[in-house]
Amino acid sequence: MRRFLLATAVVSAALSLLSSAAVGQSSPHFFFLQFCVGCHQYDGTGLPPDVPSLRDDLSYLIGSPEGRDFMLRVPGVIGAPGSAEQVAELLNWIVESFYQGDLDFTPFTPAEVLLGRERPMHDPIKERLELLAGF
């Protein structure tokens, strides 16, 4: 009986560890580390002037249709292999985790991600400069 209880405890602990590892690997933070940190850095400060900070004023991006469209189409977002739901969670996590301004924004949706994936961005620096020129 003791062996059975011990074996059950060991198996339960192993399954718990495996499931928590699987959850961790699908978290928005994990996706950020895989697909965004190379350009935007661990703390979201980016590599100005070419790669913008995620900590600075993103209001022009999260607050306008053109800006949201831009965020949905940047190479790291459009190229992320996760589901549309996971990518929407990633974008929302980025805004909530790094942006230091007003967080009154409409969360990104999986439907927006799917639309963004239909139109890949070929020159993100050029498109960002064009977008900023309009503000």
For the regions a language model picked out, list residue spans one by one:
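Electrostatic cytochrome c docking/interface patches
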Residues: S16-F31, Y42, L47
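Flexible coil segments in periplasmic/lumen-exposed cytochrome c-class electron-transfer proteins
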Residues: E85, E96-F135
